[in-house]
Amino acid sequence: MTKNIHDVAYELQKAIAENEDFKTLKESYAAVQADTASKNLFDEFRTMQLSLQQKMMQGQEITEEDNQQAQEVVARIQQDAKITKLMETEQRLNVVIGDVNKIIMKPLEELYSAQQQA
């Protein structure tokens, strides 16, 4: 009997929500949101990050001023223990999600590899 792929995806969603890194991420995010200085700095970082991504997607040049502003914000972020913990935890969770993505994509990878070898 074949499993419904959507049911498996919901099981995966539940497993991620129950993952210790995800729980720590939620706690870290709440701690950042509860601290006005951390929240403001994190919001500034996210705004800057989205602005740079938007420029890149539109093919606009990232200026030296953009780079300098980004470096200044990152330097301040590194001084904030709450944000640093949040970002480290998010990075660990991203590694797990990346690993899961590789596993999910394996059938397609094998299919195309077999097609190229034929």
From Swiss-Prot:
Pfam families hit by this protein: Com_YlbF
NCBIfam families for this protein: PRK13676.1-4
Name the family: Belongs to the UPF0342 family.
Q: What is this protein called?
A: UPF0342 protein BC_0880
